[in-house]
Amino acid sequence: WVAATAARSSRVMREESLGPVVGIMPVKDDAEAIALMNDSGFGLTASLWTHDTARAEAIADQIETGTVFMNRADYLDPALCWTGCKDTGRGGGLSVIGFHNLTRPKSYHLKKA
C-alpha cells in the first residue's frame, strides 16, 4: 500500500509500519527530509534512493535510525547488526552482537580472597 497523499501528521507518516506500507511525500531539500525522518518516536530502518553514495552517507549520518539501506530495503547482511533506536528498541539482531543479545552473556567479576 502506497500512501502518496497522506498528511504529515497521519499515522502512516509518523509510526512504524512492519508490513507492505510506505508513505511518500515531497520535500524541498535534504534538510527538510532529514527533519521529517527524525520527527518520529521510531527509528528502525531508513531506505535512501539515490545515485550519489556520498549524499546517502551524509544523510545516513544525520538520521536517527539503527539501519540504513541505499537503493534497497530487501536484504539483511547476517554479518551486520540489525538494530533500531528510539521507541523501536535497543539492542540488535543478527551478527555477533545479535547472537550475544539472544544468548544472554554473563559477566563474571571475581576477586580472590
Where are these regions (language model features)?
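Conserved C-terminal structural/oligomerization subdomain of aldehyde/semialdehyde dehydrogenase
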Residues: W1-A113
